From Swiss-Prot:
The lineage of its organism: Bacteria, Pseudomonadati, Pseudomonadota, Gammaproteobacteria, Lysobacterales. Pfam families: Ala_racemase_C, Ala_racemase_N. GO terms for biological process: D-alanine biosynthetic process. GO terms for molecular function: alanine racemase activity; pyridoxal phosphate binding. This is Alanine racemase. Catalyzes the interconversion of L-alanine and D-alanine. May also act on other amino acids. Keywords: Isomerase, Pyridoxal phosphate. SUPFAM superfamilies: Alanine racemase C-terminal domain-like, PLP-binding barrel. The active site is at 33 (proton acceptor), 253 (proton acceptor). HAMAP family: Ala_racemase (MF_01201). One of its GO terms (cellular component) is cytosol. Its cofactor is pyridoxal 5'-phosphate. Substrate binds at residues 129, 301.
Amino acid sequence: MRPAQASIDLEALRHNYRLAKRLGGSKALAVVKADAYGHGAVPCAQALEPEADGFAVACIEEALELRQAGIRAPILLLEGFFEHDELRLIAEHDLWTVAATPQQVRALAAFQSPRPLRVWLKMDSGMHRLGLSPEDFRAAWLRLRGLPQIASLVLMTHLARADELDCSRTDEQAVAFALTAGGMRAETSLRNSPGLLGWPALRNDWSRPGLMLYGANPFPQDTENTAQLRPVMTLRSRIILVRDLPVGEPVGYGARFVAERPTRVGVVAMGYADGYPQFAPNGTPVLVDGQVCPLIGRVSMDMLTVDLTDHPQADIGATVQLWGQAPRVGPLATQCNVSAYQLLCGLKRLPRTYVGSAAVGEVAAR
């Protein structure tokens, strides 16, 4: 079997969820969209369900996958519904839905639901993606609040620049949301991962932690709060070949690395098709049997190469750790000019092993 794999620590996942609850002082929906940011939505939801207040996903397909796996906790559709027919599935499977467009509000007002629906009404406070204008937001609340098919309303918005701790935009959004939602008797939801980790003055009834659940830092630098996060995913493989190169010999496509000294090269079974960033620069650190070694040469589809010259004990079969407790995925993403979100969600073909939960079992694969 090819040795590349992702190990998922479910106890670290639970720790990060508890941290989100503690920082928020509120209920929290665990965001498990995009296959739990590449960690496996079903195993992660199963591990969190005994203590989670609920879950959030992007769309109904992701919600139904959780329901079919036996998840009974509340599940919120963050993008709401795309077709009117989905409303019957939402009611049938006891899902919660966001209403973020005038079309969704009209559809909810006209829907004869077999059971009252819990709706999260979304205001655009400055993200300018999904969300109702302040005027439409107030009108939608007035229109929906007394309808028999609406069980309750939660008022929400989404922070656009909370990962920039010196940016005033977050406070401006919070004020705009408070001014519009003031006087509306309903629970509120404002804080995402950076909002929880970096903006303690913000308050809401429901938080929506996503990236932080998986132990990744949304900020360029560590803070007192982000230092408490535990990485959930460890990306590992092994050395599959070792060769010695003389001075002047290149490594990999495009000869991006040329040996300036006699160089001992280790070939690792891990490439960009596995989700490792293709444009990771020379010198990017990896751990080989616990010792830091630099990446050399361009990352290929299925392989990458590291400099073992200063680690003479390393040989074929040595364990290579690409990210996890060290190196962390956040600094790696910054070094490669991508986001941690993109790296974590990009692991499409790797098998995953799970530790830290008797409910799920020790090993599960994609």
